[in-house]
């Protein structure tokens, strides 16, 4: 028996030794797609769970996984002004460290969200955690505070009375911080070692919850930021505006994705497929059926998926926009769908995951219920799916 247990631990440890990092919101390139094989199909609270750990407080941010560590944020207190950053061992779920901050910005927000709404981003040196209060902290892998900034302290006019949720990302070795709000709106690149501004570009004052998308085109890193009525690409090195297009109807909640040079921009009127090169802009197609609301679209194996707040998954051809199928799932989705290993994962707000076969015809493979509120988008790494609920961090996968 001891030899069997040792072998099982070795197998799980080996999977993490070769695990694909999932270092930011929706994975390495922000598309929500894993390249790993052997991803789970069926699970419940009592079966198919590699480990689970109680969380100290609520959060709607996503977990991120880098170098075998799982990082997550939470917020607590009567005013939601106690901010938490935690690290767990990805193999065992053991808590590695837990750090707390006092919020410096306002904590007003919609009841559905909280101050732990932006997803952290990680690299080999540690994790960068931003909160809806405008507090931003960088920790080493061992939990040592490297630097801290109060963005509200630096820019006092920042305000959003329903909460902020845009997440930081990494581009060209810089920490990209989106800060669209009703006050001083901007997007900035920070030095990862010091937290100091490298460039800062002012943007139109607007409430916006979109996370930037990073892609490389013609040797240049583009940081693509959507907002109400406009999508803009900035040069990652300098912040120079590369291109911008108005009247595309982009969302101020769901984030864009891309595949093979095509940008899929979600909006209140559906999803638009855009081709942007060398300062020129072309709309390829627009589909009003692909309207995910708060959930970002997924493009996988040449199919675009949108999970709606009405409990319907719509699928369309990624090249033409032609509708392929729609399928009703239980509940409604706030989290964005993920994909990998030929499967598409749809997460509803009550903790039920619908697993679909990635195909041009609808086929439900499983429905898996954890029975806890799930608003944050999960992460995939080491053959496992990391799901954060309002109470628990689950690692779903074979033991």
Tell me what each language-model feature is.
Residues 18-399:
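Noncatalytic, solvent-exposed loop/strand surfaces
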Residues 1-2:
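N-terminal secretory signal peptides that target proteins for export/translocation
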């Amino acid at each position: 028996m001891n030899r069997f247990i040792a072998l099982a631990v070795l197998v799980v440890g080996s999977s993490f030794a070769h695990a694909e990092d999932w270092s930011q919101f929706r994975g390495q390139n922000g598309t929500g797609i894993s390249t790993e094989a052997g991803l789970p199909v069926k699970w419940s609270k009592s079966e198919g769970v590699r480990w689970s750990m109680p969380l100290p407080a609520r959060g709607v941010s996503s977990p991120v996984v880098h170098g075998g560590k799982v990082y997550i944020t939470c917020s607590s207190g009567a005013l939601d002004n106690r901010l938490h950053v935690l690290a767990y061992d990805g193999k065992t779920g053991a808590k590695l460290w837990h750090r707390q901050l006092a919020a410096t910005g306002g904590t007003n927000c919609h009841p559905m969200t909280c101050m732990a709404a932006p997803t952290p981003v990680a690299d080999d040196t540690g994790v960068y955690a931003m909160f809806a209060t405008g507090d931003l902290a960088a920790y080493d892998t061992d939990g040592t505070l490297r630097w801290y900034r109060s963005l509200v302290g630096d820019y006092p006019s920042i305000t959003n009375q329903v909460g902020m949720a845009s997440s930081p990302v990494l581009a060209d070795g810089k920490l990209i911080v989106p800060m669209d709000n009703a006050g001083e709106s901007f997007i900035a690149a920070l030095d990862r070692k010091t937290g100091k501004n490298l460039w800062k570009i002012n943007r139109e004052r607007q409430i916006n919850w979109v996370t930037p998308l990073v892609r490389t085109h013609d040797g240049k890193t583009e940081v693509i930021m959507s907002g109400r009525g406009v999508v803009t690409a900035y040069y990652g090195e300098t912040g120079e505006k590369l291109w911008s297009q108005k009247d595309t109807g982009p969302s101020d909640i769901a984030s864009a994705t891309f595949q093979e040079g095509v940008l899929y921009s979600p909006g209140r009127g559906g999803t638009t497929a855009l081709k942007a090169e060398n300062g020129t802009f072309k709309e390829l197609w627009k589909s009003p059926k692909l309207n995910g609301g708060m959930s970002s679209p997924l493009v996988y194996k040449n199919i675009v998926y949108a999970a709606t707040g009405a409990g319907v998954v719509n699928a369309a051809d990624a090249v033409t926009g032609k509708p392929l199928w729609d399928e009703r799932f239980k509940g409604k989705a706030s989290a964005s769908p993920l994909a990998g290993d030929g499967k598409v994962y749809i997460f509803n707000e009550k903790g039920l995951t619908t697993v679909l076969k990635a195909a041009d015809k609808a086929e439900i493979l499983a429905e898996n219920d954890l029975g806890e509120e799930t608003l944050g988008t999960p992460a995939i790494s080491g053959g496992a799916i990391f799901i954060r609920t309002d109470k628990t961090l689950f690692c779903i996968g074979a033991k």
